[in-house]
Amino acid sequence: MGKDGGPEYLTVFNGETGAAMQTVDFDPPRSILTSSKWGDSYANRSERYLAAVAYLDGVHPSVVMTRGYYTYVYAAAYTWDGTDLKEQWLSTNTPTEENGGTGCTVKYADGTSKNNTNKTLYAQGAHSVSVADVDNDGYDEIIFGSAVLDHDGTVLTYDGRGHGDAEHVSDFDNDGKQEIFMAHEAGKHNDKIIPYAVDIKRYNSDIMLQAAQGDIGRGIMDNVDDDYALSSGNLSLFWSVAADGIYNQAGEKVGNIPNTNGSNMENFAVYWDGDLGRELLDGNKLVKYSVTSGTERIYYNSKNSALPGSINNGTKSNACLTADLFGDWREEIVLRYGDGVRIYFSTIPTDYRLTTLMHDSQYRCAIAWQNVGYNQSPHTSYYIGSAALAKDSGGNTLNYLAPSTSFTKVTYPDTSLFTPRPTVKATTAPVTVTANADTYLVDSTTAHGSDEELKINQAQNVYTSSSPGLKDIKGLGLIRFDLSKYAGKKLTSATLK
């Protein structure tokens, strides 16, 4: 769009034919504010769009489009039923002092509205967005930099630390809760101005805040040395371009920052070599890191060279995509090459049996938002690492994740993207499992994904609980809940309605 503006649209295209199926006006239009109110006088910041797919009702996918993140922020959610693209709500975010403390106003499709007091997305956005169920209510939230947008368009939480370049969201410490790591350019904490910082938090509480001396263009957090994680109890580590070391979740330095040919490798993490720690990807360089010895090796052929192909986004050095495309829980790397693309995949065997990562809806949603803004690594909703492996009755470690460390995972025959998933309701009467039955028994032996896992209609697997609080679990895996509180307890039968 030129500097003089013009119409903007949101269009649904047929994925098989490329045909436009429906087009609506983009909401809101750029003209809703003057250029200076977007954060500059030449219109660039009015065009800061972010986008995501999220299961806002726990069952159906919604498209969430946002506009602006340096100052005013608008977020709109849409549903698509195969024919009509309909707006669910529009969230308008302003300075809290502008409207008597009301920082967020949400207007719904039915004409109703809702306000937030002293909470706003205003000036809190990052160059990326994440999707996760951070409050374990069964509905996806949108992690929007230093604030979290709830499934209904209101602001769930807001810390006021402002804009940043990088964010990562997962259960980094295997406690069944989502942690949020973010690198900030500017903001404040307890009324103290902090120009630059990294922090780790849950949606409603701080874990660690580390001040920095300059702009933090990149930062990352993950389990990158699984042997160290298991032996030390530091299950995930973080580092950034603004610090001189690698740190545990408490902010304590535990090792030297990775360095490979001048790169600190704080860009991307991928599962590649078959152990449960992630390798580091910066541009087309793929390396393995050790806390004790530093970078151990560069992967790709006998010359330890970079993967052939071109990278994207200049200094951000992104692949086109990283994802578990082929289902072996390791991740493929997609790079531009000439006038096409190359997909690189690991040929290294693994001893571990993990569910395909794309069956975790948080990970699947991450693949959808990965290319938005500054690309960020996708993460599962659960911790992956040796510290989370199951044990048998004799205390021997097994080669799959313990049920207490994983959320609901389900496979189902996806005959139609637009068909609502069945509702799962708990029942107290045990039943006999038969092929193609509508009722089935779920017990502790099925929760970890073993060979005894029961199949419904030859394709659907589900884990549920006898807890009254979980009597209505929707979405067959699109809603996730923590099983750790039920560890050691017998789970009961359930009925598909």
Task: Label every model-predicted segment.
Residues 1-422:
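Beta-propeller-forming repeat regions
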Residues 7, 430, 493:
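Exposed beta-strand and adjacent loop surfaces of beta-rich binding modules
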Residues 46, 474-476, 493:
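A general secondary-structure signal for short beta-strands and their flanking turns/coil
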Residues 73, 477, 489-492:
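Short beta-strand/loop motifs in extracellular/secreted proteins, especially
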Residues 422-483:
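Flexible, small-residue-rich N-terminal segments that precede or flank a structured functional core
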Residues 481, 490-497:
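A short beta-strand element within beta-rich, extracytoplasmic domains
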Residues 485-487:
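Acidic glycine-/aspartate-rich tracts in secreted/extracellular proteins
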